[in-house]
């Protein structure tokens, strides 16, 4: 992606992108997993207009807050983890345009002021799009666009510690962070995000630390980029994928197999 400028860039021949949804709780490592996939595919060094794989975050689609909502947000009293916090109409429209091979201007969001910025980021046509967010699977219309759904399953204590460190870097005090977590973040995860885990085709315990899972996913994205998309599309109709099982560490096969949803290893501790 690039900061918005001229959009009159010659488009590549239209080929419907392979859309991968990546969900999981706050600070579970979703964006880190996506970034590691990009790194292993060698896409970080490629010009943004020529990248075959791009990452898009659900965080960019937070609604514009009213003055009253923004005042509450600055006090840590607004629920950003609720489905109603997102502009699902804009999200749906943007993903549809991306699937149609269009060059798209995507909103930018300031997490310090809780504001949608006037600047946008340009997303150019790509072969594979990774869309990550805490509620990426919550809305059915959006969920059904994904041809592959990954759920990053990280221990709740680890997620909390990461959240504290991240929010303190954004200038928030510890008491506000913990109050927001217990009041909004944890209940919203249990009510809205965790139940969508059942829609995942692949569950990735421990996030980016689980390199067995990451390497297998990278391997199959390479298959897609090499034109061998049929490995993924067996059983896929109208953007929906059946539950599949990836080969385990001791397996030599490289195909995704239809069957139960993949859980690449047991979580060390349940949520």
From Swiss-Prot:
| UniProt-annotated stretches for the region Disordered | 240-271
SUPFAM superfamilies referenced in this protein's UniProt entry, alphabetically: P-loop containing nucleoside triphosphate hydrolases
**Broad enzyme group:** transferase
Q: What does this protein do?
A: Phosphorylates uridine and cytidine to uridine monophosphate and cytidine monophosphate. Does not phosphorylate deoxyribonucleosides or purine ribonucleosides. Can use ATP or GTP as a phosphate donor.
Known InterPro entries for this protein? P-loop_NTPase, PRK/URK, Uridine_kinase-like
**Single GO term (MF):** uridine kinase activity
This chain belongs to the protein called Uridine-cytidine kinase 1-B
Q: Which PANTHER family match?
A: URIDINE KINASE
Q: Which reaction does it catalyse?
A: uridine + ATP = UMP + ADP + H(+); cytidine + ATP = CMP + ADP + H(+)
Pathway field of the UniProt record reads: Pyrimidine metabolism; CTP biosynthesis via salvage pathway; CTP from cytidine: step 1/3; Pyrimidine metabolism; UMP biosynthesis via salvage pathway; UMP from uridine: step 1/1
Gene that this sequence comes from: uck1-b
Question: Could you provide one GO biological process annotation from this protein's UniProt record?
Answer: UMP salvage
GO CC, alphabetical: cytoplasm
Annotated positions binding ATP: 24-32, 209
Q: Where is the composition biased (Low complexity)?
A: 246-259
Give the EC number(s) under which this enzyme is classified.
Answer: 2.7.1.48
| Residue sites binding substrate per the record | 81, 109, 114, 163, 172, 180
Q: Where is the composition biased (Basic and acidic residues)?
A: 262-271
Protein family per UniProt: Belongs to the uridine kinase family.
Show the Pfam families listed in the entry: PRK
């Amino acid at each position: 992606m690039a900061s918005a400028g001229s959009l009159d860039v010659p488009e590549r021949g239209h080929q419907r992108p392979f859309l991968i949804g990546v969900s999981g709780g706050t600070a579970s490592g979703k964006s880190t997993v996506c970034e590691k996939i990009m790194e292993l595919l060698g896409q970080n060094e490629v010009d943004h207009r020529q990248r075959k794989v791009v990452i898009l975050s659900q965080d960019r689609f937070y609604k514009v807050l009213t003055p009253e909502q923004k005042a509450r947000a600055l006090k840590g009293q607004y629920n950003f983890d609720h489905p109603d916090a997102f502009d699902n109409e804009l999200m749906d429209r943007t993903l549809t345009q991306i699937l149609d091979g269009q060059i798209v201007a995507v909103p930018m969001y300031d997490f310090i002021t809780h504001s949608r910025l006037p600047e946008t980021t340009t997303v150019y046509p790509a072969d594979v799009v990774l869309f990550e967010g805490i509620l990426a699977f919550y809305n059915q219309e959006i969920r059904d666009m994904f041809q592959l759904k990954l759920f990053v399953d990280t221990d709740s204590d680890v997620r909390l510690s990461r959240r504290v460190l991240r929010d303190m870097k954004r200038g928030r005090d510890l008491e506000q962070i913990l109050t927001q977590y217990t009041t909004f973040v944890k209940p919203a995860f249990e009510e809205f995000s965790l139940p969508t885990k059942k829609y995942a085709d692949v569950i990735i315990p421990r996030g980016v630390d689980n390199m067995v899972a990451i390497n297998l996913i990278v391997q199959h994205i390479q298959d897609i980029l090499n034109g061998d998309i049929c490995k993924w599309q067996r059983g896929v109709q109208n953007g929906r994928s059946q539950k599949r099982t990836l080969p385990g560490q001791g397996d030599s096969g490289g195909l995704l197999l239809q069957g139960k949803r993949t859980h690449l290893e047991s979580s060390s501790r349940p949520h």
